[in-house]
Amino acid sequence: MGSPVMIYKTKASSFINFMAREIFMASIKGTKAKRLEFDFNFNDIYVSLKVRISYSDNVDVFDIWGSSSDDDIQVHISIHQKDFNTQSYNIFNAELRDLLRHELEHIGQWNGIYGKAEIYGLDPSHDLDSYFTQPYEIDAFLYGLNYKRKYLKTNILTEIDTLLNRYHSADKTISTDMIKSIWIERLKIILPHTL
């Protein structure tokens, strides 16, 4: 039998692909807000995924964000119905897969697969430099972005730049060069084949 980490990563990939498909299909069907709930079991780790999909004119095309703790993942999706179309589907699916992989990394951390996660207590909107340089966040971001870059067939440095530039456009105080430098050093250890 394989190591717990390898089993977790293999099942995580299946989970992400299946859930992204289910969530995507639910997102393009209908106009009413909906809630989806799924349960998934990784050996000894039970994962509960709760998804809230809403439709709003107050977002550009779509907005996806999530959180996790212990064995729960929460995903929030807001869609601008008129602008959400076939041209945006590919990016939507890539962002969704990135988010699911990011949050699954945290589930693995919470449950001791990668060592025990720390409780951060940081609101990312208040201290982005600290948030982006926490070891557990670095790994979660890099694994999520790696999943996204594979889906979009881009390179990881492009995805890092895109993510950090998006945050920098909202908060000019973020030290994107410093964060990117730290992330690249970590990439050399956990995902060296991506560089």
Model feature map: region roles:
Residues 16-46:
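Zn2+-dependent metallopeptidase catalytic core
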Residues 37-68:
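Amphipathic, interaction-prone secondary-structure segments
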Residues 106, 110-114, 146-147:
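Glycine-rich, acidic and aromatic/proline-enriched surface loops and short helix-turn segments
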